[in-house]
Amino acid sequence: LRKTVLRSLGSAGITLVVLLLLWQAVVSLTGISSFIAKGPLDVWGFLFMSEDAADNRAQMFPLVGQTLADSALGFVVGMAVAVVLAVAFSLFRAIEAGVMPLVLLLRTIPLVSIAPVIILMTGRGTTASVAVIGTIVVVFPALASVLFGLSRASQQSLDVVHVFGGGRLTSLLKVNMPGALPSIFAAARVSVPGAVTGALLAEW
């Protein structure tokens, strides 16, 4: 186990170094203006080498913390909405027929185009705007994954529940939901980058 952890950390470290080197190479070789794109060396100098480095860190780190908090809020709300919708869709097909087209419609509309409307309705930088935008970003991939997991329940297990008099809700709680846990965790892992993107868009 220790070797596996060390190997994973080593691979992650090497990947990070390679990405930083590629980032710096692209910025340096293409001659992109520093006003448009900063390289890792520019960021390092801004945070640790310049005369105002201490002030820069004091100003930036609280903002990073706020963005992470906003990302967590959008992630939690989006995942919760996705799970609730998936359960409702599994229990009541009429709800799926009525709500799924709206979810697909939100997915096809670029979020950048509707974000200003959401911010006007909920306020710039408010908890509501962060939650709404984060939910829109997170809910579709998470919903698709959770629905897939719920539909993959063992038919034999479902038959056992039905033989003992269990209904759809019992089957959902005792068979479908436990069987969907891997898909829920996979949805959570996939949704994290989307939650960060949603938080940045809501703050912008």
Each model region followed by its residue ranges:
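Periplasmic/extracellular loop-to-transmembrane helix junction in inner-membrane transport proteins
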Residues: 29-76
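Transmembrane alpha-helices
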Residues: 132-136, 169-202
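Transmembrane alpha-helical segments of polytopic membrane transport and secretion proteins
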Residues: 1-17
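Glycine-rich helix-loop "coupling/hinge" segments at transmembrane-helix boundaries
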Residues: 120-121, 149-150, 197-204
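Generic hydrophobic transmembrane alpha-helix motif, especially the helices
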Residues: 104-141, 148-149
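Alpha-helical membrane-interface segments at transmembrane helix boundaries
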Residues: 6, 61-73, 96, 103-106, ...
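Transmembrane-helix boundary motif in ABC transporter permease subunits
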Residues: 73-103
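Short helix-to-coil transition segments within interhelical loops
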Residues: 150-156, 160-180
